[in-house]
Amino acid sequence: MKVLALPVAVAAMLLVLAQNTQSVYIQYEGFQVKLDSVKKLDELLEQPRSFRHRMGTQRDPSVLCSDPALPSDLQPVCENSQAANIFRALRSISQEDCELCINVACTGC
């Protein structure tokens, strides 16, 4: 019985690890970014007031785009003339569980 329990325990551990390594992606306006990257974007935008003041109330994303902490999958957004609007939309989408289809109760997923 103990011989069978070890492979089952290992398989269960691998399944848990595999689930934790899968990322949730957000697709918007031709961009595909990780949910974790959008959460990092939120963190960058919630830095002290002096940073937000330099951001020009988020209308000019050049300060954000020059930040080395900006995740690499968000950097292509910086090349778009609508970068500020795209960043705003990504942040909005990331806060809606049904938009992400991660909530089983949501319809249309």
Curated annotation (Swiss-Prot):
Small and large intestine and atria and ventricles of heart. Both uroguanylin and prouroguanylin are found in plasma. Endogenous activator of intestinal guanylate cyclase. It stimulates this enzyme through the same receptor binding region as the heat-stable enterotoxins. May be a potent physiological regulator of intestinal fluid and electrolyte transport. May be an autocrine/paracrine regulator of intestinal salt and water transport. Disulfide bonds join C65-C78, C98-C106, C101-C109. It is found in: Secreted. Keywords: Disulfide bond, Secreted, Signal. Residues 24-94 form a propeptide. Belongs to the guanylin family. Its main location: secreted. It comes from the Eukaryota. The gene is GUCA2B. The keyword Disulfide bond applies. GO terms for molecular function: guanylate cyclase activator activity. Residues 1-23 form the signal peptide. This is Guanylate cyclase activator 2B. Transmembrane segments: none annotated. GO terms for cellular component: extracellular region.
